[in-house]
């Protein structure tokens, strides 16, 4: 069964900089002007991550551009946004984040089938420099293989 996703923003750097061990979907609390701006595709999650404050998770450094037609009722572009998860999921993830070396990174932001904005989060562990080099070599080898197959 395929799921409908209208992708707003993706964090391709996260897949290069981190080992993604677990993925999860979370809702996000937004203001009206933020939703309108997202419908226009004006968002960036390149540097965004999730952190906990007590028993809640927030998304930090997510840039959603101001909506031009919202005038004085506009939002702050980089404000912390609350993430919506079930309590059991949240406790489990917060426990894993507290382990040294793990972080919760935003991988993509999209509209689901019901036109709700969702954020795909990844429980990630940072890659070392030699790991990054290895992944670059692997991508180059895959690219060369596909070229050789096409030439034959």
Swiss-Prot record:
Purpose: Required for rescue of stalled ribosomes mediated by trans-translation. Binds to transfer-messenger RNA (tmRNA), required for stable association of tmRNA with ribosomes. tmRNA and SmpB together mimic tRNA shape, replacing the anticodon stem-loop with SmpB. tmRNA is encoded by the ssrA gene; the 2 termini fold to resemble tRNA(Ala) and it encodes a 'tag peptide', a short internal open reading frame. During trans-translation Ala-aminoacylated tmRNA acts like a tRNA, entering the A-site of stalled ribosomes, displacing the stalled mRNA.
Pfam family, one: SmpB
GO biological process, one term: trans-translation
Subcellular location: Cytoplasm
GO function term, MF aspect, one: RNA binding
Record flagged with keyword S-adenosyl-L-methionine: no
GO cellular component, one term: cytosol
Gene3D superfamilies reported for this sequence: 2.40.280.10
Disulphide-bonded residues: none
InterPro entries xrefs: SmpB (IPR023620), SsrA-bd_prot (IPR000037), SsrA-bd_prot_CS (IPR020081)
Gene: smpB
Taxonomic superkingdom: Bacteria
Record key words, sorted: Cytoplasm, RNA-binding
Family: Belongs to the SmpB family.
Organism of origin: Rickettsia canadensis (strain McKiel)
SUPFAM superfamilies, sorted: Small protein B (SmpB)
Protein name as it appears in the record: SsrA-binding protein
UniProt keyword Transmembrane helix present: no
């Amino acid at each position: 069964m395929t799921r409908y996703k209208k992708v707003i923003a993706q964090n391709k750097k996260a897949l290069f900089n981190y080992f993604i061990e677990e993925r999860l979907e979370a809702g996000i609390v937004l203001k009206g002007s933020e939703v309108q701006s997202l419908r226009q595709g004006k968002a960036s999650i390149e540097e965004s991550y999730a952190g906990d404050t007590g028993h809640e998770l927030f998304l930090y450094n997510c840039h959603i551009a101001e909506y031009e037609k919202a005038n004085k009722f506009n939002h702050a572009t980089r404000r912390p946004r609350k993430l919506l998860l079930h309590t059991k999921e949240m406790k489990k993830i917060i426990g894993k984040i507290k382990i040294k070396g793990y972080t919760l990174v935003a991988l993509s932001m999209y509209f689901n089938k019901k036109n709700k904005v969702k954020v795909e989060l990844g429980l990630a562990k940072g890659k070392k420099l030699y790991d990054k080099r290895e992944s670059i070599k692997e991508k180059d080898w895959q690219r060369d293989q596909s070229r050789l197959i096409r030439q034959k």
